[in-house]
A protein has these predicted regions:
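Short, small-residue-biased leader/transition segments that mark boundaries at the very start
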Residues: 1-8
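Membrane-embedded alpha-helical segments of inner-membrane proteins
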Residues: 9-178
């Protein structure tokens, strides 16, 4: 005779099996592989932009005076970015949102072309929404911000050329956002 615990285990496993009922996985197409590789690359970009936000807006008075001395090649660029802090913040926010939305679209394309969820709407939601949100938060926000908060000046000096480029690239959007 089986115990009550075995009955509960069987019921739990049946519910878990029902969650995966009708789910099929197919080999990813070349387009799907490119999409997921681009998404991973953009996840690094998201982390870079998020880290830049913390680094540029967390510089200490000592860091700022060191930047004013201009000992490093990026110091003038950092000063120029900080002198237009509203536009800097607008550029960072626009860049981060653009990258994150693109990551979500690429991952949706990848999952839609490789995993067919059938009637498993809950599993589809869990995989695409919860897992993707977790990855974006962990690798695109939290970890990069922790690193840059501990290395503000060093990170700003490395990030200044790329952020200056983004400032120019998103200039029409950031300027219109500031003047709203």
């Amino acid at each position: 005779s089986r115990g009550l615990g075995d009955v509960y285990k069987r019921q739990y496993l049946c519910r878990l099996a029902d969650l995966f009922d009708g789910v099929t996985v197919t080999a990813p197409t070349m387009g799907a592989i490119i999409a997921i590789l681009l998404a991973v690359l953009l996840l690094y970009a998201s982390g870079f932009v998020s880290a830049s936000e913390i680094a540029f807006f967390s510089l200490s008075p000592v860091d700022l005076s060191e930047i004013e001395e201009g000992k490093h090649t990026s110091d003038r660029r950092i000063s120029a970015l900080l002198n237009d802090s509203e536009r800097l913040l607008a550029t960072i926010l626009i860049s981060n949102n653009f990258v994150n939305v693109t990551i979500i679209m690429l991952c949706n394309y990848f999952f839609a072309s490789t995993i067919h969820f059938g009637n498993s709407v809950i599993l589809e939601f869990l995989l695409i929404t919860v897992v993707l949100t977790f990855l974006l938060l962990l690798f695109g926000e939290i970890m990069p911000k922790i690193y840059s908060a501990q290395n503000t000046l060093k990170f700003c000096r490395k990030a200044a050329p790329a952020i200056s480029f983004l400032k120019k690239f998103f200039s029409p959007l950031s300027l219109s956002l500031i003047h709203i």
